[in-house]
């Protein structure tokens, strides 16, 4: 599947190649496998035919010589390769050829992994001293339960990951016929198809129909009852997190929830939460709400930091605001202001090739309508206060949410 947005104004090309190889496919006990495997994809390519092997230093020099950038990363749902290069024919051809090698011929050297493993373990050890890390880990596990969305990389899970694990994960995930390739830049459709084929040329060329179907990933289970966790920690600020599983990215109510969340806590200083918790009571510098929809129901989260002795008061106000918003919905004035702000800021979502690429990749990955960007503002404008009240009541259950408070004091 190849999506192209022609952008001839600048002689550049941005490409993203996505595969179903995100952390949702991490095996139990090996949390972090996808992200660690993705990091190793940047550390060397194997020799093939007359092409010599290249270590990470040689790759870095090669990309610098081309004035191009290449990267690999694993998110929650997908494994992504990105390429940014000049569209001048000779440089473009060389950049695509080198990217194809990194996509199709990773070295996965054990000596490199053993070195990088120590860096990962040191990073985890440092992260475990941060209140936000500890609170976030407890929150994710409580919201998602046994679902992979709640898996958290630990020293134990890193120790369980081997180079053979990475190779197996890569082989299962990076399959040419399952790639979704998105391009934005100074090329035409014919060039886009050629580049897409070239990027996948080093992978086995097999039809998806002949391959076993990817194992389904279970859906996120709704919460059956409220969960309250209070974690002792000596810190200058207490961490407060409240939320639950939300909705999928392709949910028909996406735009309704977008506007609704802007009013509740996504709009910064114009949101209800900020007004009630910060402006009226001075209990925090900032409080925000967000949804993280993906292929599965990502979390709805309200987060804030406050003085340890004010945590209980801040939490009480936060819960009250959520309950009232879900029960009564927004006012007409709030809806108009939110829609005006969102529509007014739409241009900033697509004002660069990289932002366009992110949007096009999002459309392709989530099977959204091809006119998604063309109709974005109109869909926001159609949202009503009644829509928001109904959608919030359907998606959120304030009496069954997870609450994590870390570092509170009486």
Task: Cite the ranges covered by each PLM segment.
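M16/insulysin-pitrilysin zinc metalloprotease superfamily fold
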Residues: 3, 44-53, 83-117, 267, ...
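An aromatic/glycine/proline-enriched structural segment found at the starts
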Residues: 146-152, 180-248, 405-410
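Non-catalytic, conformational "gating/processing" segments within enzyme and secreted inhibitor domains
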Residues: 132, 137, 163-199, 400-401
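C-terminal regions of mature proteins
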Residues: 1, 180-186, 221, 304, ...
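M16/MPP (pitrilysin/insulinase) zinc-metallopeptidase core fold and M16-derived inactive scaffolds
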Residues: 16-83, 148, 152, 268-282
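A structural supersecondary motif
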Residues: 23, 69, 241-245, 265-306
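Acidic/histidine-enriched segments that form metal/cofactor-coordinating
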Residues: 58-169, 190, 336-354, 358
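Short acidic/His-enriched helical or mixed secondary-structure segments at domain edges of catalytic enzymes
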Residues: 119-137, 218-237, 278-284, 295, ...
């Amino acid at each position: 599947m190849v999506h192209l947005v022609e952008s001839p104004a600048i002689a550049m090309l941005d490409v993203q190649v996505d595969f179903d190889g995100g952390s949702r496919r991490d095996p139990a006990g090996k949390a972090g496998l996808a992200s660690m495997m993705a990091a190793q994809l940047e550390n060397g390519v194997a020799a093939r035919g007359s092409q010599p092997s290249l270590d990470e230093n040689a790759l870095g020099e090669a990309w610098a010589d081309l004035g191009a950038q290449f990267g690999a990363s694993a998110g929650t749902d997908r494994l992504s390769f990105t390429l940014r290069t000049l569209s001048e024919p000779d440089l473009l051809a060389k950049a695509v050829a080198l990217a194809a090698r990194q996509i199709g011929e990773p070295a996965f050297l054990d000596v490199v992994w053993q070195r990088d493993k120590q860096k990962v373990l040191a990073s985890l050890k440092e992260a475990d001293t941060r209140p936000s890390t500890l609170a976030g880990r407890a929150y994710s596990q409580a919201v998602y339960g046994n679902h992979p969305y709640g898996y958290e990389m630990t020293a134990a899970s890193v120790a369980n990951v081997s180079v053979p694990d990475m190779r197996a994960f890569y082989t299962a995930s990076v399959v040419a016929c399952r790639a979704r390739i998105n391009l934005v830049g100074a090329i035409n459709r014919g060039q886009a198809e050629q580049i897409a084929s070239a990027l996948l040329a080093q992978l086995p060329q097999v039809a998806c129909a002949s391959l076993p179907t990817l194992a389904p990933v279970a859906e996120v289970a709704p919460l059956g009852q409220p969960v309250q966790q209070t974690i002792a920690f000596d810190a200058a600020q207490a961490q407060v997190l409240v939320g639950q599983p939300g909705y999928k990215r392709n949910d028909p109510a996406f735009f309704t929830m977008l506007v609704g969340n802007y009013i509740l806590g996504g709009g910064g200083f114009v949101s209800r939460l900020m007004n009630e918790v910060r402006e009226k009571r001075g209990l925090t510098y900032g409080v925000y709400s967000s949804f993280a929809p993906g292929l599965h129901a990502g979390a709805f989260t309200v987060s804030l930091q406050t003085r340890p002795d004010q945590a209980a008061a801040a939490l009480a106000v936060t819960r009250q605001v959520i309950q009232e918003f879900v029960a009564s919905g927004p006012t007409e004035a709030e809806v108009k202001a939110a829609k005006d702000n969102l529509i007014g800021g739409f241009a900033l979502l697509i004002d660069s090739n990289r932002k366009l690429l992110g949007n096009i990749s999002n459309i392709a990955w989530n099977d959204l309508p091809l006119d998604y960007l063309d109709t974005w503002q109109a869909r926001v404008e159609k949202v009503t206060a009644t829509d928001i009240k109904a959608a919030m009541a359907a998606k959120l259950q304030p009496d069954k949410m997870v609450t994590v408070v870390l570092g509170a004091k009486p």
